[in-house]
Regions:
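Short glycine-/acidic-enriched loop or helix-start segments at secondary-structure transitions
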Residues: 16, 84-87, 96, 268-269, ...
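Residue-level signal for inorganic ion chemistry
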Residues: 23, 46, 75, 102, ...
Length: 506
């Protein structure tokens, strides 16, 4: 029996997992690292801390697993996307990484849009332009840290830096390259037009390969330090969004999944990028060669739920204690009936991406009366998040048909949300056994395919559905009326959101 090691190099830390080739989870370990905020809109992490966490979690799962280490065939990483990691020709790190959440490069966004129209950028990259994309951060570094820019041999992504430490190779994959604002999503090559417009040298960008590319064996001295066999192959891997698609079992055209965590998104699998005329959705490059995953993403899904729990019940972010609060709130929701006077919640606590892409939008409760209770507001929050997801689904369905949807992510532990999402979306949903392991499963699948243990159809061994939920027919008509009011309310408040953003209290 062969084994596969996967790492989910996320925003809060690195999670290592060990799977058997038949899909069984053998061991897992997590180690966190610090995030730095050196100025307004600036968010950084130390890649050396990523490496320390990677080494720690690797050591811990090897100690937990009672297996012959020589049977570990491959390793792959799912990495946080849109980071920039500058290294010199020897692979030496030159500064802390500017990570995905950093928005300092707004100036570079304006400069690029002055040269290339937004619609042309969307056609080339498959995405709306954002200061979070790696290419804009590289342009910022060239302007404000020119010495560092000149000394940089390659600008890497998060997972690519760990791969460099393991193998000595400078490389990235299609899924990460697509989210740089420098890559042509149709030809899967660097866009000389966009690179030139930003004034960046293409020689400073790594070669791009399929996610399942074999980078070779771990360097002997590194393998010895980690306790891994030097025969263990390193497979290039993918960004976390792409890995989640694989780990959700979305590996064939038409497969669709919904991730419901702090943020949320709906992705479906296609043979071509989906270029929406209103630019409401974006397209990613899949780990399955030749496929894409058009997606619509919202900012504050589980975040809305955490906010309302903290505000009304004093229970904060979604950690271990949430298992109890989910059950408690589910019980209250089951015991209560929908109030005769409906409340609408617009879930825009952090602005919004899909489908309206409005950073000025804000969270809003409409229709409160003195007879409403706390639990009525909780219900409205769940409904509001679900309705925004329906709006995203409609944006996708204008271009392609969508059937059954698999739902993953920590928030889906709520029984009420499962039923409500199915009913409001009007779709049958399925829930897999390991709702929290999608990115790890995706990285493991990519490793196994890359080393030849199986092909992507083996995902059925890793992703096993344990629940199927149908829409509640008698509730759908009421929800359709509310959904219409939900969209009308947003449009009615657009100007108010914009003007409110200009009001600052001293």
């Amino acid at each position: 029996l062969k084994y596969i090691m996967a790492h989910d190099l996320g925003t809060t830390g690195d999670k290592a997992t060990l799977f058997s080739q038949t899909g069984s989870l053998v061991a897992s370990s997590f180690a966190g690292y610090e995030t730095f905020y050196p100025g307004p809109g600036m968010v950084e992490q130390d890649p050396e801390a990523w490496w320390t966490a990677f080494c720690k979690t690797t050591s811990e799962i090897l100690q937990m697993a009672e297996i012959d280490r020589k049977e570990i065939s491959a390793l792959s990483i799912s990495g946080q996307m849109m980071a920039v990691v500058p290294v010199d020709r020897s692979g030496k790190l030159l500064r802390r990484s500017i990570i995905w959440a950093d928005s300092r490069s707004s100036e570079q966004v304006r400069e690029l849009l002055a040269k290339v129209p937004a619609s042309d950028l969307y056609k080339i990259t498959g995405s709306r332009l954002s200061p979070t994309y790696q290419g804009l951060k590289i342009a910022w570094l060239k302007k404000y840290e020119p010495d560092l820019y000149e000394r940089t041999f390659k600008f890497l992504q998060a997972k690519d830096y760990i791969n460099l430490r393991l193998t000595g190779r400078f490389a990235t994959d299609f899924s990460d390259a697509v989210m740089t604002a420098l890559f042509d999503i149709s030809s899967l090559t660097w866009s000389e037009e966009l690179i030139s417009a930003l004034g960046i040298e293409s020689s400073k960008l790594p070669d791009v390969h399929a996610s399942i590319t074999d980078l070779g064996e771990i360097r002997k001295e590194v393998a010895a330090d980690l306790g891994l066999p030097s025969s263990c192959k390193v497979i290039l891997g993918a960004g976390d969004g792409c890995s989640a698609a694989v780990g959700a079992g979305a590996v064939e055209v038409g497969d669709t999944y919904l991730y419901l965590g702090s943020s949320a998104w709906i992705s479906t699998i296609t043979e071509e990028p989906l270029l929406d005329k209103e630019m409401r959705v974006f397209s990613g490059a899949h780990a399955v060669n030749g496929l894409y995953f058009p997606s619509g993403t919202m900012q504050a899904a589980g975040t809305s739920y955490s906010w309302i729990k903290e505000t009304l019940y004093g229970v904060g972010s979604m950690k271990e204690s949430d298992r109890d609060i989910y059950s408690y709130l589910d019980t209250l929701l089951c015991q209560s009936h929908r109030h005769s006077e409906s409340i609408l919640y617009l879930p825009y606590l952090l602005g919004e991406r899909s489908p309206m892409w409005n950073s000025n939008a804000r969270g809003t409760l409409i229709g409160l009366s003195a007879s409403h209770k706390k639990i009525d507001i909780v219900r409205a929050v769940i409904e509001g998040v679900s309705m925004n997801l329906k709006w995203i689904l409609e944006s996708l369905e204008e271009s392609l048909p969508i059937g059954k949807i698999r739902v993953i992510g920590g928030v889906i532990k709520s029984r009420i949300w499962k039923r409500m999402i199915s009913t409001i979306l009007g779709k049958t949903i399925t829930i897999p056994q390991n709702v929290d392991e999608a990115t790890s499963i995706g990285a493991a699948m990519i490793a196994g395919v890359g080393v030849g243990l199986f092909d992507f159809s083996a995902v059925r061994n890793f992703v096993v559905d344990v629940e199927e939920i149908e829409p509640i027919g008698e509730q759908q008509e009421d929800y359709l009326k509310l959904y219409g009011l939900f969209k009308e309310s947003y449009h009615a408040l657009e100007k108010t959101f914009e003007e409110l953003n200009g009001v600052r209290r001293g």
